[in-house]
């Protein structure tokens, strides 16, 4: 990153000492399997070496779950094949650059971004939580360098048409005033002895001291504004008159609008959203590319699965490639096909598995991106982070890469609410652009004149995906169906995250290992 602004970069080296293949869970409780035992939370290093010798596995789908499974299984001696319906590996791990084509069921778009390695759009996963240890471990092992991803930025905006006259509010002012008002309210209750039953005398003094700092209260425990909110005129960059604080918003105004009571207020405190967040330098597909390079010889592209059959303690897959149907037989199958697609493939699944597959719900999440002069940096001092609105576009993301450069890719919409995302998905690409321009202009008045070259991805319309990530809670699908094991982010505790796909792959490998050593 050539720029004059310091940004931390975590470079994942090639050392195998900290790679996923050598990490163990010392607290895991073993499960007795005769001559073989496995921890409840299985991971590489827990499976017996060469345990797959003479056994074969067919994996349906070359996404992260499929490629993780293949990478680890072949190290155990299994003969592994991956059947991928599309012409690329990675599944929903995709990065769109100049010239790339997005094909949906009823439309096609070509990306018109300038040819520049810094100008890219991650329409699927776009961030990595710092505690997603296995994904980060693979990045280290595969030499995929990571950089900081700014998830929360107090210089970004909060907007509701029904709050503060529809004027976007700089996040730092809202957070400061919420903390200050609530702290003052609680301090007043303590000083009026309203909490005597809950607090000792020492507790009261200590809590009051904490509240004074937490809410930036004065010596009378009143809130009359804070420098944390910035200064009038130029909230994000200071002003010529540093003595003029921004007018305090009273508590009733702050809580009167349902949007200002909602998800954004604790977004960055969510377990998977807490700082530090990370992203691969150059695009999320760097991870998919690294995996692909290690299992490339195992993948058959353009292999559309037509049937999944059980045959005398083995599995037969019938797939079609270039109009020709082929049978592929294996001892075991790991199926990572999204249930939205899987439900329409003829199969021999148990009735319980079929029922859960047919009722499994996916998010209709969608994203849209524009290329633009970095007006958010140059004019508003917003460097990365997310602005929120209760319009359909929901979020605007500012890029965390190439800070200080002239142009960047701004995410003009990230929509996952069911009604809004469905409506967005039903629009034509141009209609989506038009809507995003109008709504984005309500946050940044220069928006329509600055952004261009819009491109969108509605995951419910993407062939062989038909959804963004799983929403339902799996039960039966967590169990093998004879020699068929299901995997994918939708079957993990971390739905919608690459780490979840990896954990699900580990579970699938563990199930196969238990069968082999039964």
Explain the meaning of each model-derived region:
Residues 23-44, 314, 320, 364, ...:
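Conserved flavin/dinucleotide-binding core of flavoenzymes
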Residues 301-413, 443:
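Mid-domain catalytic core of redox enzymes
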Residues 151, 165-168, 174-194, 342, ...:
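Rossmann-like dinucleotide-binding core of oxidoreductases
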Residues 40-42, 46-51, 112-120, 262-276, ...:
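Short glycine/proline-rich turn/loop motifs
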Residues 41-185:
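N-terminal glycine-rich phosphate/pyrophosphate-binding loop and immediately adjacent elements
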Residues 1-57, 75:
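Extreme N-terminal leader/targeting segments of oxidoreductases
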Residues 155, 162-163, 187-304, 311-314, ...:
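Active-site/ligand-binding neighborhood in enzyme catalytic cores
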Residues 118-129, 273-281, 353-361, 418-430, ...:
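Active-site rim elements
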């Amino acid at each position: 990153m050539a720029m004059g602004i310091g940004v931390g970069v975590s470079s994942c080296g090639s050392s195998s000492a900290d790679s996923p293949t050598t990490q163990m869970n010392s607290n895991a409780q073993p499960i007795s399997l005769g001559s073989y035992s496995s921890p409840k939370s299985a991971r590489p290093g827990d499976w017996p070496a060469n345990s797959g010798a003479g056994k074969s596995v067919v994996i349906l789908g070359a996404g992260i779950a499929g490629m993780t499974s293949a990478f680890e299984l072949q190290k155990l001696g299994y003969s592994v094949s991956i059947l991928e319906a599309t012409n690329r590996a990675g599944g929903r791990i995709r990065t769109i650059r100049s010239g790339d084509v997005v094909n949906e069921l009823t439309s096609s778009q070509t990306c018109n971004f300038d040819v520049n390695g810094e100008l890219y759009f991650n329409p699927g996963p776009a961030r990595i939580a710092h505690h997603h240890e296995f994904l980060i471990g693979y990045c280290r092992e595969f030499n995929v360098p990571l950089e900081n991803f700014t998830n929360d930025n107090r210089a970004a905006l909060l907007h509701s048409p029904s709050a503060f006259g529809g004027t976007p509010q700089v996040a730092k002012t809202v957070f400061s005033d919420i903390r200050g008002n609530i702290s003052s309210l609680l301090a007043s209750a303590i000083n009026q002895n309203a909490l005597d039953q809950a607090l000792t005398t020492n507790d009261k003094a200590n809590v009051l001291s904490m509240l004074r700092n937490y809410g930036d209260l004065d010596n009378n425990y009143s809130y009359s504004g804070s420098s944390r909110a910035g200064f009038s005129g130029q909230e994000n960059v200071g002003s010529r008159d540093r003595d003029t604080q921004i007018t305090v918003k009273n508590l009733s105004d702050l809580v009167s609008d349902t949007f200002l009571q909602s998800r954004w207020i604790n977004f960055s405190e969510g377990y998977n959203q807490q700082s530090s967040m990370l992203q691969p330098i150059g695009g999320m597909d760097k991870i998919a590319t690294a995996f692909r390079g290690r299992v490339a010889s195992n993948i058959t592209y353009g292999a559309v699965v037509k049937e999944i059959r059980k045959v005398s303690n083995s599995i037969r897959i019938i797939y079609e490639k270039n109009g020709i149907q082929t049978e592929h037989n294996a001892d075991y199958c790991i199926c990572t096909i999204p249930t939205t697609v899987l439900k329409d493939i003829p199969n021999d699944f148990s009735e319980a598995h079929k029922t859960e597959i047919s009722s499994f719900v996916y998010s209709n999440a969608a994203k849209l991106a524009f290329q633009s002069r970095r007006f958010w940096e140059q004019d508003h001092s917003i460097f990365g982070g997310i602005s929120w609105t209760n319009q359909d576009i929901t979020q605007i993301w500012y890029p965390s890469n190439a800070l200080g450069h002239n142009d960047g890719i701004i995410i003009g919409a990230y929509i996952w609410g069911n009604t809004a995302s469905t409506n967005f998905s039903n629009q034509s690409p141009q209609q989506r652009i038009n809507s995003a321009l109008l709504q984005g202009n309500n946050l940044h008045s220069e928006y329509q004149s600055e952004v261009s070259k819009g491109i969108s991805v509605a995951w419910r319309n993407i062939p062989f995906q038909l959804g963004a990530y799983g929403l339902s809670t799996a039960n039966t699908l967590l169990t093998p169906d004879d020699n068929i094991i299901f995997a994918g982010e939708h079957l993990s505790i971390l739905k919608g995250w690459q780490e979840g796909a990896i954990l699900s792959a580990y579970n699938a490998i563990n199930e196969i290992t238990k069968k082999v050593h039964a």
